[in-house]
């Protein structure tokens, strides 16, 4: 018996609205998670290369701790484990304002921040040591040398691997469905449940993820070409 496709289920009833809401939530979740991951990655990646051992140790502990625990565990930890430890007023505020969304955002941010740290560290290690030595010789402190010279160059060198990590973050946002975040995968499952059309619903989700990923990769490829530094190639950390 041949399967009969009914693509109209994707825009009839509530399905179209669910898809758009899921797409919007995925974009918002990924964007906020990326901002947190980038900030943590830049700071901890730089800390792992500074001359001061305590800072290197602190950043290494963060990276190893968050990178080596599955993202799914962090989703559960921040959603189920942390709220009971908070004051009641804060806990009630969180659950009134989408605790599952913020738990998912934080889990994505700290997990991918640890992975982004390795990307930034690799970019810094790709910079000739003479760049740092010249900055210090001009009278800059270590902090100023990193802020004004080393980190800006490292960011440009790290664009290709950072793009890959950003795409991983986008795709990993689907894990948030396990804590009831109504992102794209959650909504495609909901459409499948209500319409009994798994192939159509999951195909729609697949195509949307593909369009998002290809779009981001295309934009970032142009950014990489624009900011490429001839003669310097980032190495993996």
Predicted features by range, described:
Residues 1-237:
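Transmembrane alpha-helices and adjacent helix-loop boundaries
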């Amino acid at each position: 018996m041949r399967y009969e496709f009914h693509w109209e289920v994707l825009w009839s009833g509530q399905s179209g609205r669910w898809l758009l809401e899921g797409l919007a939530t995925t974009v918002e979740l990924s964007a906020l998670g990326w901002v947190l991951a980038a900030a943590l990655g830049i700071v901890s990646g730089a800390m792992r290369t500074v001359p001061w051992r305590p800072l290197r140790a602190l950043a290494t502990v963060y990276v190893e701790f968050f990178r080596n625990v599955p993202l799914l565990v962090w989703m559960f930890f921040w959603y189920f484990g942390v709220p009971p430890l908070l004051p009641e007023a804060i806990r009630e505020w969180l659950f009134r304002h989408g605790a599952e969304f913020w738990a998912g955002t934080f889990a994505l941010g700290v997990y991918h921040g640890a992975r982004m740290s390795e990307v930034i560290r690799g970019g810094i290690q790709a910079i000739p040591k003479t760049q740092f030595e010249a900055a210090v010789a001009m009278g800059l402190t270590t902090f100023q040398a990193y802020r004004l010279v080393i980190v800006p160059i490292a960011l440009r060198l790290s664009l290709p691997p950072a793009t890959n990590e950003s795409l991983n973050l986008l795709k990993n946002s689907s894990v948030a469905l396990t804590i009831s975040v109504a992102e794209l995968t959650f909504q495609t499952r909901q459409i499948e449940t209500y319409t009994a059309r798994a192939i159509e619903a999951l195909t729609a989700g697949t195509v949307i993820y593909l369009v998002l990923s290809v779009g981001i990769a295309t934009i970032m490829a142009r950014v990489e070409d624009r900011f490429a530094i001839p003669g310097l190639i980032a190495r993996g950390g």
